[in-house]
């Protein structure tokens, strides 16, 4: 299989795409990454729609999408256009179409772009299981072409662009039966429609591969880019994690998916989908776009590194086990979290640890490992004595200006793990190997931690360690280019079983949230990393960073430490106040660790886009809700006044309920 989907996974270069115009906005080519969003008002409500469009435009949104589910919505587009013209608005509009080709033919007259979903534009999903012969499959494609071609020809005639937007949760029965519920199915779904458009000489196409799980979404976009390379296609990519949710969780999921793809050079326009006021999506999108609009190509240090991943599926990078008393990491253990704490004296240190435990208790999480940040050598004895009061390992991060003399090496045998830079703290390589051997013989671990620019110098070390039987070593990096440098480290270590700790040091919690989600999150969804360690320079940030670390693991779906919510961003199809409903359901179910609950505004992105949710709460009509167990409807048309209680009872009936703690 050809794993190549970009220029290189080890450095930045944006993928070259064709330029597609959406009104006066240019997407792809050499243009900056374009920001877009979607209003959530009813499209038949002229004033409400215009108000939201203008608010988004003022916030910096460059393209605005609105849902057009019915003929009545399409008929109101001229009124919206007229009011926008009066207000002096020039923002291009996109009509979002599901199920209704006839409505698309009306809407195309009044918008700059049409978005169609290849999973439901010409198909009604019946969840039917059947074998398609090649003949039958081709007959289905001919049927689709008959339905789709009139819209393509009208777009071509009017100069209207189109997004062919696949959703993981709404693949057609035809695709599901041939390719399954997979990234490959998502890609082939879009390619079927692209080929029809190309056969009619139409190329003003933008493509998206959206999913609520960032891991699936990233794999699908990579596979699409790889197929584009094979087929000599150069269409721009619209990036987005659908149903990301709200708050930090929604921002983390979006940054993992969108940000890691932008690092790969993929993406020409982005939409951050939050279950919040649409205006609040724009600053998040701008933050992500600005980072990469300023980024320049850098392929200077990529030679000598080879692809060691399958970028289209998840496979955890195998490593040997780290076992310190009750602490276990690596091998098949969950990804662990290490917390950095300062040390002034025993009292303040133990007080900070106690605060961390107390905060962790409120999250139903206990701290797992602590690293003391750059203590003075004469503090080691006091730290060792303080650590005896704790049931979790306490390690030492050596200051860069500390030389590891023999006296200090002996004192460090009191600690289960130390972190050091081999290029700064040892002048003699043989002495370093002797030190590592001594620690291993004592059942202790050592973390080799150096800067990303020293990777070339690090290349031979794993071979040397393996030759002399040193196994109790893990590797980490201090780097501003977390994704690229850790991939290089992964390439170096791909023949070995040394564990990898993903380290990120940031100036403040907001920077930590976005950059750790992009860098560390982007690595985790590829199976790289056995532990994570995120820090800022301020002790006051420790609780926030502690929670961020576990939220990041939650966002990658590698470790669920709280209820997982899959909630759509709301649009004109939504049949209830999604923000209020989501908040209400969270207040009732937020303590159900590991349970996955989907909250969907309507059926379009309902059952399918719930992905692997255990339970679903989906709008069925005004004041009515369908409740799901998995993808199966178990209660239909439940009055919204009692739907929350019925959901709780459904969870109880399936023995996944636990009463909230009184703590």
From Swiss-Prot:
What's the EC number here?
1.17.7.3
What name does the UniProt record give this protein?
4-hydroxy-3-methylbut-2-en-1-yl diphosphate synthase (flavodoxin)
Q: Which reaction does it catalyse?
A: (2E)-4-hydroxy-3-methylbut-2-enyl diphosphate + oxidized [flavodoxin] + H2O + 2 H(+) = 2-C-methyl-D-erythritol 2,4-cyclic diphosphate + reduced [flavodoxin]
| Superkingdom, natural source | Bacteria
Q: Which UniProt key words apply to this protein?
A: 4Fe-4S, Iron, Iron-sulfur, Isoprene biosynthesis, Metal-binding, Oxidoreductase
Q: Which positions in this protein are listed as binding [4Fe-4S] cluster?
A: 568, 571, 602, 609
Concerning Gene3D superfamilies, the annotation shows: Dihydropteroate synthase-like, Sulfite Reductase Hemoprotein, domain 1
Q: What does this protein do?
A: Converts 2C-methyl-D-erythritol 2,4-cyclodiphosphate (ME-2,4cPP) into 1-hydroxy-2-methyl-2-(E)-butenyl 4-diphosphate.
Chain segments annotated as transmembrane: none
For biological process, the GO terms are: isopentenyl diphosphate biosynthetic process, methylerythritol 4-phosphate pathway; terpenoid biosynthetic process
Q: Which PANTHER family match?
A: 4-HYDROXY-3-METHYLBUT-2-EN-1-YL DIPHOSPHATE SYNTHASE, 4-HYDROXY-3-METHYLBUT-2-EN-1-YL DIPHOSPHATE SYNTHASE (FERREDOXIN), CHLOROPLASTIC
Q: InterPro entries from the xrefs? A: Dihydropteroate_synth-like_sf (IPR011005), IspG_atypical (IPR017178), IspG_bac-typ (IPR004588), NO2/SO3_Rdtase_4Fe4S_sf (IPR045854)
Note how many cofactor molecules are bound and how. Binds 1 [4Fe-4S] cluster.
The GO terms this record gives for MF are:
4 iron, 4 sulfur cluster binding; 4-hydroxy-3-methylbut-2-en-1-yl diphosphate synthase activity (ferredoxin); 4-hydroxy-3-methylbut-2-enyl-diphosphate synthase activity (flavodoxin); iron ion binding
- Protein family membership: Belongs to the IspG family.
Pathway named in the protein's UniProt entry = Isoprenoid biosynthesis; isopentenyl diphosphate biosynthesis via DXP pathway; isopentenyl diphosphate from 1-deoxy-D-xylulose 5-phosphate: step 5/6
Instruction: State the needed cofactors, names only.
Output: [4Fe-4S] cluster
